[in-house]
Amino acid sequence: MSITTIIGPMFSGKTTEFIRLIERKKIAGKKCLIIKNYRDIRYDSDDNDKYHVTTHNNIIYRNCDIMFTDNLNKTSLIDTFQEKYDVIGIEEGFFFEGVTDFSNELANRGMEVIISTLESSYKQEIFSEIGKLIAISEDVIKLKAICMGCKISDASFTIRTIESDEKILVGGIDKYQSVCRKCLNLHKRKNTLSTESEQINNQTELSEPTRQKESLKIKKRRIDS
């Protein structure tokens, strides 16, 4: 039938839009299922109360069948869904390996697929799986947040505010912010200066002439940039 993909940075309202589209299908009499990943437990208070979708501003949606999995590479799942549901919603699609092929097969079998997902990492590197998904989607809805830096401009990017090199780190406002391009560049500049300061501090083990030489190099890079 079709694939609709909702993308945008964190805090841009992707889950709110996702819930809105699912609820419209419910009102139209469609049988709907939402798939969540086991890793996404940010707003689950306990194991007995996890079968819901929750937005960042704590709107809770339960008016739909919900299942948890971390593996979409099962033909049996698609066969079961085809028999029971008209609409399949996938929350936080970037968590799932194979989400593109899975969604494509569902759509080819006559189901509607609605996916909410980040399209890129905190380093502004696109998730390759989501790039493929966008290419085969009939509809792509790109949302923007409000910049948490200047609190004026629209935000199209997500930055991580804690030190971690993990590509995917589950979290909310405690670990991430949405920012505009200007604030993104300020953030990158701040991180660069922090790294350079660490390099200068690490030069205490070098000889005095070598330390002065390295310090001059770093200062020159700052001036040139």
UniProtKB/Swiss-Prot annotation:
One of its GO terms (molecular function) is thymidine kinase activity. Zn(2+) binds at C147, C150, C180, C183. The keyword Lipid metabolism does not apply. Residues 197-207 have a biased composition (Polar residues). It is an enzyme of class 2 (transferase). InterPro entries: P-loop_NTPase (IPR027417), Thymidine_kinase (IPR001267), Thymidine_kinase_CS (IPR020633). Residues 197-225 are annotated as: Disordered. Its EC number is 2.7.1.21. Residues 208-225 have a biased composition (Basic and acidic residues). It catalyses: thymidine + ATP = dTMP + ADP + H(+). Substrate binds at Y122, K167, I168, L169, V170, G171. One of its GO terms (biological process) is thymidine metabolic process. Keywords: ATP-binding, DNA synthesis, Kinase, Metal-binding, Nucleotide-binding, Transferase, Zinc. Pfam families: TK. ATP binds at G8, P9, M10, F11, S12, G13, K14, T15. The active site is at E92. The keyword Acetylation does not apply. Belongs to the thymidine kinase family. This is Thymidine kinase. The gene is TK.
